[in-house]
Amino acid sequence: MFSEVGLFLVNIVFSLLGTILLLRAWVYALRVHPFNPYSQAMFKVTDWLVVPLRRLVKAGRFWDWTSLLASWLSAVAYLILSAVILTGSFDALSNLPMLLLAAVFTVLRWTLSLVFWIVLLQALLSWIQPQSPSMPLLRSVTAPLLDPIRRVLPDLGGLDLSPLVLLLLTQVLNMVVTRVAFSLVPI
């Protein structure tokens, strides 16, 4: 029972941290205004990890490589802690190549979950409270993902099914990535 609770807590903490780091990289790529209150909160939560890493890896023109590296390192730590909680030990040397690859798939899983929740939040807010102060940020973050789907889907006269299509797509991809990630590392 304690291992289940420990695994649950490790999953929550590292998934949230990794997802916030991915969102930080995404917001950087979209050039969202850094003084946005949501961006400021994200920076405050993640600066303890990103700022020291920035001495080693600089942010690029388009991608914040430091935040992506920090998210990947969070995934590595998550997988190691999960293995230790479940088995009581972890042989890092024999499992290192698979661990590093599984961390990539874990980051992909977190990315797909982030897309799912942001699109769902934007869709719900557009129905419930379209004038919400967070809607401009949500629109700017989801537009690059939804616009290609909108171009393919037929116009239904005010009914936008692109969020539904993207939600289904992310769930299917998340199932595939999760299966691959957990088959790589014997946890």
Regions found by a protein language model. Give the residues of each.
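Selective transmembrane helix interface/packing segments
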Residues: M1-I187
